[in-house]
Amino acid sequence: PETLFHGMMPFLHDSPPNPRLLVNPGTISMRVSPELANIRPVILGAVVRGVDIDEEVIKRLMEHQEKLHFALGRGRKRASIGVHDLATISPPFRVEAVDRNHSFIPLAMEDEMTIDEILAEHPKGVDYAHLLDGMDKVPIIFDSKDAVLSFPPIINGDHTTVTTKTRDIFIDVTGLDIRACESALMLICLQLSVLGGKIESVRVNTCEGKEWTLIGSPIEHKVERSLVEGILGNPFTDDQI
């Protein structure tokens, strides 16, 4: 509802369109191993600070996340999102390719499980194991203390869960499609900014050796008139367009 509210404001209240997302420069970095190039090459991140979170906000955030997994992520293949309580983790972060015998405590579990056990026994692992078929190594996001934040695109670590006490959030988005990943990250950040959060960039050193940071500037897209008229259900003159 937050992103819908943002989009409808110019129509309902005659306010000027504001497609720009204010992104403040941050100090957190994330380094991606070159090994990820053939596993899950797109890995992005951002921080949102000062969010006032209650149970309803958590519910809406999780619902939004799953809708993006379905629509933009194509079942988490093109893009998947991880949301973490920043207070429980220690930057800088790094993303490594690990063997399937690596173990950690996944979300909603009490004991450590290996990667193979998660893929065979954890509900999310069973649902999405096919995305890692044929891969000897899988991606893991670590913090500076070697704690596991996430095993994308499957499951987060148990200790990073967002709760009503959370105020600062780290978001990771990983996948195969840069446009889908950037769009998913922008939409989650937009939702949290409407709730009062302040967005900060994360400096990502990609698997290709390049540097990426979130930029909140709008992107222009050219569309055919027929598409606009088809969506809105009316023909338009040149002046109206």
Segments from the language model and where they lie:
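RNA/tRNA-interacting regions in translation and RNA-turnover enzymes
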Residues: 1-241
